[in-house]
Amino acid sequence: MRVLYTGADGYIGAVLGPKLLSSGHDAVGIDTGLYRRGWLFDDGCTRPMVISKDTRQLTTTDLTGIDAVVHLAELSNDPLGENDPGMTMEINHEGSVAFAKKCKDAGVQRFVYASSCSIYGASGDELKTETSLVDPRTAYAKCKVLVERDVRAMADSRFTPVFLRNATAFGASPRQRFDLVLNNLSGFAYTSGTVRVMSDGSPLRPLVHIDDICQAIVCALEAPREAVWGEAFNVGDETQNYAVRDIANIVNETFAGSVLTFGPAGADDRSYRVSFAKIKEHLPSFCCKWDARLGALQLKSVFERIQLDEKVFNAAPFTRLAELRHLRDTEQLDPRLRWTPMKDMFPAVAAE
C-alpha cells in the first residue's frame, strides 16, 4: 500500500515512518518543518523520504497514486490551541477538512485521522465510549469534533475515513516532546530531581505510548473496509486510565531520589476516563504493549544515554508552544504560520 503521512517530522511521525516501512508499506512523509530543530537522539531506524511542504499547499496532483493517508499534521495540544484559537480553527479544522477533500478527489481510498480523547472534556468517573456525548473545552478539542463530523460526511463507497481518538501520548521519540504530562514529569525528575505537579493531581487522564498509537494506525490502514468505514476508535487501554497523581507517583518511583510536590487544585476541569473496548473488537490485532511505568523507564534510559540536562530539557524545540512563539517572534513564520522566505528577510542581499 502506498501511504502518505503528514507531520512526518513530528513526535509521532518520527516513530510512525519506520513502523510503516517495517509493516511492508511504501511510505512517503510530508512536513513543513516547524519542529525539525527538536531532534533529541538517533534511534538508528530507516525512515521514508520526507518532502518539505506545507499540507495546505498540497494539490490533488500531489496526492495522485496514494492509496491511504495518515493525517497527523495539526497545531497540537490544548495550550497551543488556546494561544491562538482563530489560527487553530483555520489550520486544524478548515485546513484538515480541505485536505481530506483533496485526498478524496485524488482517489485516496483510506483517510486515517489523528483525533483525541480530549474531546470528552470533563466527565469525571464516567467511562466514555465512542457514542458518549462529547464536551470539548478547548479550541484544539473543538476542532477534533468538527473534523470528525465534516470528514465523516465525505464517506462513500470509494472513500473510507477512520478517526483514532488517541489518549494522551507519552514515550521516547527522536523528535521528542516535553509538553506531555508523563514526558514532562520525567524530564523534570531527571534534570532537577523534582517531580512537580502544578495541580493537586486529581484530574483523570488516559495515557497511550506513541508506539501503540503507531500500531493502531497500521491496524486502521490494514483492516477490512467494513471494520473501520466512518468509525471512531478510542486508542489506549482501560488499565491506563490514570489520575495525574498516579502518573507522578510512577515517575517519582522510577527516578530514585526525586522529590514529589503537588500544587493546589487548578482551574482546569478537564478530567475523563475512557473505554477502549471498541478498538479491540473491530481491530483484534491491536493491543497496548506499554504502560506508564515502562514508558518512564524508557525515558530514563534515553536521558541517561544522552546525558539530558536542564538546558536541553527546557529548550524551545521540545515544547510546541515555545517553538512556535520563537519562530514567530524572530519573523521566520508569518502570521498564518507559513515560512518567511529568506529573500523577504534580507531584501538587500537578495537584490544582489
Question: Residues of each region from the PLM?
Answer:
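N-terminal Rossmann/SDR dinucleotide-binding element
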Residues: 1-68
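C-terminal substrate-binding subdomain of Rossmann-fold SDR/epimerase-dehydratase oxidoreductases
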Residues: 193, 198-352
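NAD(P)H-binding glycine-rich loop region in Rossmannoid oxidoreductase-like domains
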Residues: 55-91
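NAD(P)-dependent short-chain dehydrogenase/reductase
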Residues: 149-205, 210-219, 249-254
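SDR active-site strand-loop-helix element
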Residues: 6, 30, 69-72, 111-117, ...
